[in-house]
């Protein structure tokens, strides 16, 4: 899942940063972190990255319920920890990390973060729009068409294409909803 990829990414980055001497911790954007030792919010030398990752995974079965029943997108202490950090490494994958919403929130709150800004993230999340922008600037892209379900043709030859084709949802993450149709 995109959540698991995010946890794996964050774990690897956190370990690398800590190995280089940085005070880094893993924070689950949805479930947050409770309690927080505000005297040492970014962990001491004995901070266990793998234990933090397992703690995050412990919410996997309940994550949709947690998101549905809560008033805020962000879990407890997430924004406060991000504001206290020198910089936030964005390890989120999928719609919640790549669509520009988190980046826009961070921009509004003055939180420094890695990666692209909110506008480029939002534009790139829509693969059809991204393709149009690339084509306008003569960036080579594979042949493709965008269509809505209600306008979908059942005859691939009407589109000037032949099998096999790659079918991708327009606004999913980079590898979500990808199918090869023969």
Residue locations for each model-derived region?
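ATP-binding N-terminal substructure of ATP-dependent carboxylate-amine bond-forming enzymes
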Residues: 1-119, 123-125, 129, 136, ...
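Glycine-rich phosphate-binding loop of ATP-grasp-fold ATP-dependent ligases
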Residues: 6, 142-146, 164-182
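Residue-level signal for beta-strand positions within conserved beta-sheet cores that form or flank
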Residues: 20-22, 140, 174
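Generic hydrophobic-segment detector
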Residues: 84-87, 163, 167
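Basic phosphate/pyrophosphate-binding loop/patch that engages nucleotide-derived ligands
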Residues: 133-141
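Acidic (Asp/Glu)-rich catalytic clusters
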Residues: 158-160
